[in-house]
Design a protein with these regions (language model features):
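Compositionally biased, intrinsically disordered or low-complexity tracts enriched in glycine
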Residues: 79, 91, 182, 191, ...
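Long, internal scaffold/assembly segments composed of regular secondary structure
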Residues: 157, 161-218
Length: 321
């Protein structure tokens, strides 16, 4: 009997230790979207589920992300679980390594980078300055980044094969200001953005502007929304902004009766004047008692070309675990 109890205790201890090194998280959302493009109405229901498995052993960890995504109403995507980000992180002394496959992060100017295999980031800190080398199996993708803080101002410089990227961020009297610039080797392909944030009396206020040279295109999916998915000409079904198009916007966010409410007013100053567009986006988010979150988004895009006017109502039910 004592042996059986001892074996059970050891097994329980080993099981606990094994489980403690593995974490499973995930989320799922279902969206109903009603779109009215100058009187032509469409409806669709999409779903997306994500599962993340994170494991670790000492200073080494592994991240595996899987997804079931029907965002394009594609039968294969709706029924097939696919691998997304898969990477390993570890360290040797002061040197950190991340390698595998993952998407980059969205910015105001650019959408996240295409997921490729063989990605790596080697990084370290020297006297408060962060140094990193990033790339993949293609030599042309290699970049070097230097980042640090000077007198409370965060600075970074990233040298890529065909362009240099600079960011500056800080705050003055409670006003946060962030500047980003992409200096391309080719003529007329530079672009830059400025973001200003300020909070007062329970309201979060923000202003963003993004400027592109005649040969540069803004594709970001952070503050403005997915600029790479903007329909600018329903007649030819052109998607995304034209090169040289500038974007600006003002936003306000607050809490009202237990709901998070925000509004954004966006102006697209298109290269082709007939494609200038004013966008009003209203979003209300509420946590429900059943553990889900309901988000209602209404978007009104008013184009200088009436045929491109579009109203969208999106209802999203989401859960995280």
């Amino acid at each position: 009997m004592k042996k059986q109890l001892l074996i059970a205790a050891v097994a329980a201890t080993m099981g606990t230790a094994a489980i403690a090194d593995i974490a499973i998280t995930g989320n799922m959302k279902v969206n109903y979207t009603n779109t009215d493009t100058n009187g032509t109405v469409s409806n669709k229901v999409n779903h997306e589920a994500n599962l993340v498995i994170a494991g670790s052993n000492g200073d080494t960890s592994v991240h595996i992300e899987m997804a079931l995504d029907d965002s394009a109403n594609d039968t294969a995507q709706a029924t097939t679980v696919g691998l997304e980000d898969v990477y390993l992180t570890t360290s040797v002394g002061d040197i950190k390594l991340k390698t595998g496959a993952w998407n980059g992060s969205d910015t105001i100017l650019d959408s996240d980078s295409t997921r490729t295999s063989g990605n790596y980031i080697v990084s370290t800190d020297i006297s408060g300055v962060a140094l990193s080398v990033e790339g993949d199996t293609q030599e042309a993708s290699t970049s070097v980044k230097v980042a640090g803080t000077v007198s409370g101002v965060a600075l970074s410089y990233k040298a890529k094969a065909t362009q240099d990227e600079i960011t500056v961020a800080g705050s003055i009297a409670g006003v946060s200001i962030a500047y980003a610039n992409i200096d391309h080797d080719d003529a007329n392909k530079d672009k830059s953005s400025i973001k200003v944030d300020y909070s007062t009396n329970g309201f979060d206020l923000s202003y963003v502007t993004a400027d592109a040279d005649s040969g540069a295109t803004i594709t970001g999916d952070s503050w403005f929304g997915d600029m790479a998915a903007v329909v600018r000409n329903t007649g030819t079904n052109d998607i995304g902004l034209e090169a040289g198009t500038d974007v600006s916007g003002f936003g306000v966010k607050t809490t009202l009766a237990g709901n998070t409410v925000q509004a954004k007013f966006i102006e697209i100053d298109a290269t082709t004047v007939a494609e200038d567009t004013s966008i009003v986006k209203l979003v209300a988010t509420r946590a429900l008692a059943n553990g889900t979150t309901l988000e209602v988004t209404y978007t009104d895009a008013d184009s200088d070309t009436a045929a491109d006017d579009q109203e969208t109502l999106d209802l999203e039910l989401a859960v995280k675990f």
